[in-house]
Curated annotation (Swiss-Prot):
Name this polypeptide is given: Tyrosine-protein phosphatase cdc-14
Composition bias, Low complexity: 463-479, 526-541
Motif (Nuclear localization signal): 366-371
Any one GO biological process: regulation of cell development
Lineage: Eukaryota, Metazoa, Ecdysozoa, Nematoda, Chromadorea
SMART domains, alphabetized: DSPc (SM00195)
All residue ranges annotated as the Tyrosine-protein phosphatase domain in the record: 196-354
C-alpha cells in the first residue's frame, strides 16, 4: 500500500489545504504560518511557498485584480519548475497566502486561486468548471469578487469562475499560447511612455490610449503623436484606427500614412447606443487587418465595444469577456458599462449565426416550452421552495457576507452576490454613488483621471519593489526560491525550458545568423524560428535597454553588442506585440555588474576597462550632401573591407579617433554640394597673400611694410 505523504491539516491553526494535483500540488490559506508543526513527517516532505508580496497589482482605485497576463505567465512557469524539481525529491508543493494584517488577505487569496486555476486549465488540461471546483473545494470562506476601476461603490462583481472561463475560451480560440509569449515585451508596451497598448485578440484587435496632435507630457502622463505608432502598426498589419473619444488629433495624420480611420464618439464613462455598437461591429468585420481601438485611456469605452464584438463573433458571455479583457488590459470596462454588457449579451449573440449559440438557444427554448406546458397545472403561487436535487444544479453563492467597518465599528453586513446574477447588478445600499460621466473639480473626465493614476503608479513601481525577504520557507532545502527566472520559456508541449550556457559564454541554442531588419533599418525581434525549434529561444541577457524617442522601441542588448547576435527567429507571431522597433542610433546601458564588464572585455580585445561602449570610426574622405533622403545604415561600411562581419572581428581598435582630427578643417566646396577635409593652415603661403588688392591704399605703404616684416 502506497504511503500517503499529503500534508495533513494541523488542528492547532485555522487553515485550509486544497489538493489540486494528487500528492503534488496544494493550495493553502494560513492565517498564521508560524503555527505549523515543523516536526510533522508530512511537513518535512513538503515545500511551502509563500505567495505574499511576490506580485503586485497596481490599482486605479479599489480594484485589485485579476493579475495581468505577464504575472499569470511567470507564476505558471514557476509552478511548473517547482513541481518538476520537487517531484524528483518525492516532495509536495504547497502554494499558500497568509493573513499579514494588511487587509489584503482576501484579495491575494482570490488572485492566487485564479492563477492556480488557470495553471490547471493551461497545463493540466482541466476545464474551467473543474478547475474552479478544485481551487474552491477546500475553502470554508468563499472567494470575493473582482471589482472594477470606478471611484464609487461597485455596480458589479466579476466572479472567479467567469475569469477562468475567459482563460479557457482564450486557449480554445488561440488567443493564449504560452509556448510563444514574451512577458518582457508585454510589460514594455504596457507602460505609458512606450505606447500604453495591449493586444486583446492577437492579430485582430488592439487596445491603446488616445493619441494627441504632438508628443508631450502633461500632468505626469506622456501623450504620443499619431506618427509614434506608425512603424509598429505597419509591422503588425494594423490597418484601421477607431476613435471613440473627442478629437484630440487630426485624423488625416493616420489616413495620409495609409491607415483607415473611423470616428464613433460617445461620452466618457457612458455606454454606447445600438447604432454605435452596430457600426463598430461592422467596421471590425469588414477590416482584413488588425483594428486598433482607443478612447481617452483605452479602458472603459474601448473595452465595452470590444466585448460586444467578442460576444457576437465567438459567443462569449459578458463575464468571460470582462475577465479576459482585464487579464490582458487591467481596468477595462468600468461602472455602468458592466451591467450594459450583461443586458446586451443575447442581442450580440443574435447578430451572428456562426458563434454556435443559436443552435443551443433554440433547443433550450423548445425544451423549456415543453416543460412549462407539462407543468402548467402544478404552478404554485406561494413561497418559492427549492428542492435539494435542484439546488445541486444551481450555482451557489460563492461570495461571503462581508461586514463593512466604519470608524472601528461594524455595520450591517452586505451580501455580495456572485457575478452574473440579478442581485450582483443591484447595489445594496451603496456607500458612495459616483457619476462616471461627470467631470471633477479640475475638469477631468474619467479617462483623464485613469491616465494620471496609471502614470503615477508605474512611476512609483520603478522606485519601489516587493520585499523579497518576506518569503518564508519552513524546510531548509536547495529548492529554488520563488523568484521569476529571466531564462524560463515553454516549448510546444507547455513544458519549461531552461537554456544552459555553454563554455564560450553563450547558450547552447546559439545561432550565427544576422539580425533581421525591417526596410527602415529597425530590428525585427522574434521568439521562434520557422521550423518550430524551441532550442533557439533567446536567453535573456538582463541588460535590455528601453528608450522612448520618435517611435516605439524595444531594444535588446544583443542589438548593441554584435557578438551577442539575437537568436530570435523569423516566424510571425501574434500572441503579444511582436515586432518591437529599434532606434536608428544605438543607445547603451551603463552597467557596473561583473557580467557587463566581462562582456565589454570580450568585445574589446585591447582590454579597455572603461564601461562606455566604443564604436568603430571609419576613415571619411568626403561627405556628399544630396537632396533626397536615404534611410540611415545600421553599420557604416569600412573602406577596403567586405560585407562579411567576420572581417570586422579582425580589426584591432584601441580608442575612437576624434572627428575631425586635430589640425583638420571641413571646408564647403564651391559647388555647395560637398565638403572637403583640409589642413587648418595652408603650407608655403606667402604672408599677406590673402589680403585684398587695395590694402596698400587703405592702410598705407609704411604700415603695410611693418606688418609684413
Amino acid at each position: 500500500m502506497r504511503e500517503d505523504h499529503s500534508p495533513r491539516r494541523n488542528n492547532t491553526i485555522e487553515n485550509t489545504l486544497t489538493e489540486l494535483l494528487p500528492n503534488r500540488l496544494y493550495f493553502g490559506c494560513f492565517p498564521n504560518p508560524d503555527a505549523i508543526d515543523k516536526s510533522d513527517k508530512s511537513v518535512k516532505k513538503t515545500c511551502f511557498i509563500n505567495i505574499n508580496n511576490k506580485f503586485h497589482y497596481e490599482p486605479f482605485y479599489e480594484d485589485f485584480g485579476p493579475w495581468n497576463l505577464s504575472v499569470l505567465y511567470r507564476l505558471c512557469v514557476q509552478v511548473g519548475k517547482l513541481l518538476e524539481v520537487e517531484e524528483k525529491r518525492s516532495r509536495r508543493v504547497v502554494l499558500f497566502c497568509q493573513d499579514d494584517g494588511t487587509g489584503q488577505y482576501d484579495k491575494i487569496r482570490v488572485n492566487t486561486a485564479y492563477v492556480l486555476g488557470a495553471y490547471l486549465i493551461i497545463y493540466q488540461g482541466f476545464s474551467a468548471d473543474d478547475a474552479y471546483l478544485k481551487v474552491s473545494s477546500g475553502e470554508t470562506v468563499k472567494f470575493v469578487g473582482f471589482r472594477d476601476a470606478s471611484m464609487g461603490s461597485p455596480q458589479y462583481l466579476l466572479h472567479l469562475h467567469d475569469v477562468l472561463r475567459g482563460i479557457e475560451k482564450a486557449l480554445k480560440f488561440g488567443w493564449l499560447d504560452f509556448s510563444d509569449f514574451d512577458y518582457e515585451e508585454y510589460e514594455f508596451y504596457e507602460r505609458v511612455e512606450n505606447g500604453d497598448f495591449n493586444w486583446i485578440i492577437p492579430g485582430k484587435i488592439l487596445s491603446f490610449c488616445g493619441p494627441h496632435n504632438e508628443s508631450r507630457e502633461e500632468n505626469g502622463y506622456p501623450y504620443h503623436a499619431p506618427d509614434v505608432y506608425f512603424d509598429y502598426f505597419r509591422e503588425n498589419k494594423v490597418s484601421t484606427i477607431v476613435r471613440l473619444n473627442a478629437k484630440n488629433y487630426d485624423a488625416s495624420k493616420f489616413t495620409k500614412a495609409g491607415f483607415d480611420h473611423v470616428d464613433l464618439f460617445f461620452i466618457d464613462g457612458s455606454t454606447p447606443s445600438d447604432e454605435i455598437m452596430l457600426k463598430f461591429i461592422k467596421v471590425v468585420d469588414n477590416t482584413k487587418g488588425g483594428v486598433a481601438v482607443h478612447c481617452k485611456a483605452g479602458l472603459g469605452r474601448t473595452g465595452t465595444l470590444i466585448a460586444c464584438w467578442m460576444m457576437k463573433e465567438y459567443g462569449l458571455t459578458a463575464g468571460e469577456c470582462m475577465g479576459w479583457l482585464r487579464v490582458c488590459r487591467p481596468g477595462s470596462v468600468i461602472g455602468p458599462q458592466q451591467p450594459y454588457l450583461i443586458e446586451k449579451q443575447k442581442f450580440c449573440w443574435s447578430l451572428s449565426q456562426s458563434n454556435g449559440v443559436h443552435l443551443t438557444q433554440n433547443k433550450e427554448e423548445k425544451r423549456n416550452v415543453r416543460r412549462l406546458v407539462n407543468q402548467v397545472d402544478d404552478i404554485n403561487l406561494g413561497e418559492e421552495r427549492i428542492s435539494p436535487k435542484s439546488r445541486e444544479n444551481t450555482r451557489p453563492n460563492i461570495l461571503r457576507r462581508r461586514v463593512q467597518v466604519q470608524n472601528g465599528r461594524s455595520t450591517a453586513p452586505v451580501t455580495i452576490a456572485p457575478a452574473g446574477t440579478s442581485e450582483s447588478r443591484r447595489s445594496t445600499k451603496p456607500s458612495r454613488v459616483v457619476d462616471e460621466t461627470a467631470l471633477d473639480d479640475q475638469g477631468r473626465s474619467q479617462g483623464d483621471r485613469l491616465l494620471q493614476l496609471k502614470a503615477k503608479h508605474q512611476h512609483e513601481s520603478e522606485t519601489t519593489s516587493p520585499n523579497s525577504s518576506s518569503s518564508r520557507r519552513f524546510v531548509k532545502s536547495s529548492t529554488p526560491q520563488m523568484t521569476v527566472p529571466s531564462q524560463a520559456y515553454l516549448n510546444r508541449n507547455r513544458e519549461p525550458i531552461i537554456v544552459t550556457p555553454s563554455k564560450n559564454g553563450t547558450s547552447s541554442g546559439t545561432s550565427s545568423r544576422q539580425l533581421k531588419t525591417t526596410p527602415n533599418g529597425n530590428v525585427a525581434y522574434r521568439t521562434r524560428n520557422s521550423s518550430g525549434n524551441t532550442t533557439s529561444t533567446l536567453t535573456r541577457t538582463g541588460n535590455e535597454s528601453y528608450r522612448f524617442h520618435n517611435s516605439l522601441f524595444y531594444e535588446p542588448a544583443s542589438a548593441v553588442f554584435p557578438s551577442m547576435a539575437s537568436r530570435r527567429s523569423e516566424t510571425t507571431r501574434y500572441l503579444s506585440p511582436t515586432t518591437p522597433i529599434k532606434p536608428m542610433s544605438p543607445s547603451y546601458t551603463d552597467g557596473t555588474s561583473p557580467r557587463y564588464k566581462a562582456r565589454l572585455r570580450s568585445e574589446n580585445p585591447i582590454g579597455s576597462t572603461t564601461s562606455t561602449p566604443f564604436s568603430l570610426q571609419p576613415q571619411i574622405t568626403k561627405c556628399s550632401l544630396t537632396a533626397e533622403s536615404k534611410p540611415p545604415k545600421r553599420i557604416l561600411s569600412m573602406p577596403g573591407t567586405s560585407k562579411s562581419t567576420s572581417s570586422l572581428k579582425k580589426i584591432q581598435v584601441s580608442r575612437p579617433r576624434p572627428y575631425p582630427s586635430t589640425g583638420v578643417r571641413v571646408e564647403l566646396c564651391a559647388n555647395g554640394k560637398s565638403y572637403d577635409i583640409r589642413p587648418r593652415k595652408e603650407a608655403h603661403v606667402i604672408p599677406g597673400a590673402g589680403l585684398a588688392a587695395n590694402t596698400e591704399a587703405l592702410l598705407g605703404v609704411c604700415k603695410l611694410v611693418n606688418t609684413l616684416s
